[in-house]
Each structure stands twice: as structure tokens, then as C-alpha cells.
Amino acid sequence: MDTRPIGFLDSGVGGLTVVCELIRQLPHEKIVYIGDSARAPYGPRPKKQIKEYTWELVNFLLTQNVKMIVFACNTATAVAWEEVKAALDIPVLGVVLPGASAAIKSTTKGQVGVIGTPMTVASDIYRKKIQLLAPSIQVRSLACPKFVPIVESNEMCSSIAKKIVYDSLAPLVGKIDTLVLGCTHYPLLRPIIQNVMGPSVKLIDSGAECVRDISVLLNYFDINGNYHQKAVKHRFFTTANPEIFQEIASIWLKQKINVEHVTL
């Protein structure tokens, strides 16, 4: 038994979609979450800067005595995950491979779409992972840089959000049977995305898929938490306004949480 928390990092609130699934599947595990909303989005930033910011988040989580770090951010996974994984002596998990694997299982026509931040799409990481495992699958990637600001400003239900999503996804409509939400912010726009793409297109939440791998690693390294612990205290940190973060988090997690401000 290992009662240390699992650390989650993201550029903002998007990683809460992963946390929500982890709380559902592994309610006995403690969580420490850091969202860098003050510097979001990461997608348009240079690689060097994304690496620098990611390491700051990692180092913060290490001060919290975490037993595992989850990159609940596709951009950070694409740019810095391999480097961090090689440098640390605790398990470090990203969201890309679980999402790619789920897309391969889902597609029936071999036509997969991937939407993400400009950096995630430019890295071509999803296409590489998918075609490494299933070379015959055609992958269409599309950067959606306006999605993260919508979520970070809590405007997911606005008419502007609907128009932006509709206009952004137009190039993929009718051309794919599976769509990877290659940014953990995007599931917060899922109803609009599904409506635009149509009911026949399967949406893959890369973050939710990641939780299955978390469970496997906890077992493999024998670091599961206390299964009998009922009241688990999580900690949430943000580099921006805690009230805005708390508002979004409480809606998504369906519980009121306390959010602490941190300066990196």
C-alpha cells in the first residue's frame, strides 16, 4: 500500500477531465493537481518554453511527494514527456498513447481525425503513434487553437463557442469515423463537437483512456492506495485566479473543491 498522491499537471483546467475519470474509477487514490492557467494555452508557444514550463510543474509536484506523475496535457506530452520520464525514478504517464490505441480500436473505416493545439498537431505525435501500430489507418490532423481559451474563460455554452467549434471542425465533417480529442480541454466542449461531427462519429477522450493505464502502472509498481479509505483529500493548485478554476472544476467534478493559488 502507498498512500502518497498521484500528481497531475496541465496547462489549465483541461486535465480535470482526466481527474474526473480517475475519481470515478479509483476513488481511493489521492490527487494533487497543478493547472498553469496563468500561462495557458501552451499550444502556440515555442517548444523550449513549453519544456521549461512543464519542468516547473513537474518540480512543483515533486515537492508534494507524489508517487506518479500524469501529464494530463497533450501538448506537454508531445514536447516534454519522454525527457521527464527518462529523468525521474517514479512512473510518468502521458495521454497520447492511450488515446491513439483507443482510436485504433474504435475506427471501422480506417479514417481517424485528431484535433489538438498547434504544437500537438505540429509534432505529428498522434499520427506517428497510430500508424506505428496500424499503418493502414489514415489520420487527418487539425489544429483548433481557439478551443482552449473558450474553456479557460468558462464560455463552453456560449453561442460564440458553438460558432467557433462549427467553423473549426468543418474540414473534418463527413471524412472520418473516429475523432481523437487530442487536448484534455476539449471534452469540456464534447456536446458541441459531437453535434457538429454527427452521431456516427466516435469521440475518443485521450485523458479518460489514460486512467486505464494509470491503474495498470499502480498495480505493476505495487503502489496502489488504501482501497478501504473512504474520505480521500485531494489538493488542487492553479497559477491563475482560484475562483474561476474552482467554478469550472466544481461543475466538471460535480463537487465543491478548494483551490489554492501557487506562483511558479
UniProtKB/Swiss-Prot annotation:
> Which keywords does UniProt give here?
Cell shape, Cell wall biogenesis/degradation, Isomerase, Peptidoglycan synthesis
What positions does UniProt annotate as the active site of this protein? C73, C183
**What is the official name of this protein in its record?**
Glutamate racemase
Q: Does the keyword Protein biosynthesis apply?
A: no
Provide the species name.
Streptococcus pyogenes serotype M49 (strain NZ131)
The record's section on NCBIfam families has: glut_race, PRK00865.1-3
As recorded in Swiss-Prot or TrEMBL, the protein's gene is named murI
Q: Which family does it belong to?
A: Belongs to the aspartate/glutamate racemases family.
> Which function does this protein serve?
Provides the (R)-glutamate required for cell wall biosynthesis.
Looking up Pfam families in the UniProt record yields: Asp_Glu_race
